[in-house]
Amino acid sequence: MRPVVRPLALAIACLLSTSALAVDGLDPKAFKVNQGLGHAALTQTKKTVKVLASLPITYGLAEVLLKGTDVQLERAAPANLPGSRQVSYFTGRGAPALNTLAQDADAAIGLRSLWADDPLYPVARRSNIRIVEVDAARPVDGGLPGIAVQPGSADGLNSQPWQSGNNMGRMADVMAADLGRLAPSAKPKIDANLAALKQRLLKLSAHSEARLAKADNLSVVSLSDHFAYLVSSLNLDVVATDARPDADWTPQALQALSARLKDNDVAVVLQHRQPSEAVKAAVTAGGAQLLVLNVDGADPVAELETNVDQLIKTLTPDT
């Protein structure tokens, strides 16, 4: 009689356990039955943590922090799609793909505190009410300090505050803290990656200061709105910033640019893209050197290291 009762009791127990799990708000599908030593044991199946990012800076930093972990990082937009076009992308042709990615995603990394129009989290939330927002510029819960914003800065994506090593380090801190809470088993590796990243930034800062001490002329003019944080972090002398499009550089404006460069003995003119030949000629006529720096690269830490190195080399040609 006993052999018959035991399987029946086991079946009833399993049914009761499933009901109890449902009452407790747990999904019975997330558990599997393991039978060992004559007993049935419930083991929760492990779900891989999935994180979405769409901007070069958020995806790039997340990739560095999550290297060597089992956290699944998904690029939610094409790598070459500018942030300014992501609103139309996620609400248009990219909507089906984001809907699919978001359905089982745990978090979306964005920059809404810096760029209010950042569409990733709001649009992803339409497909998954449980998805968590990670704001890389300022923690949603205020648990850590956010990035330092320059007074009077219009901000948005163009200002690129992460071109400052201090700000990039703060962004990495914010992201690592949230990612470690989302994936506790990956936290030791995330923390190790964070420490290595910040060590690179500290080394960059120390070496930059020592190298710039040898420069005779630290005056620069920027023809881009992307480098205010970079030149400020290096304590350079910014004579002017004029980010007008090439089409707006009239002959009179070009003459005025050349005169300003000469009058202020400007050493370097910065741009994030190749300017027109007319602008190049005006810079040369003003006695300055044009330097085109990179933005929105795949590896933001390496990009910052390269930009700083190129800028210092241009300012210290004889060292």
Labelled PLM ranges:
Residues 22-319:
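Extracytoplasmic metal-acquisition and chelation regions
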Residues 1-7:
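Positively charged n-region of N-terminal signal peptides that target proteins for export
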Residues 7-19:
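Bacterial N-terminal signal peptides
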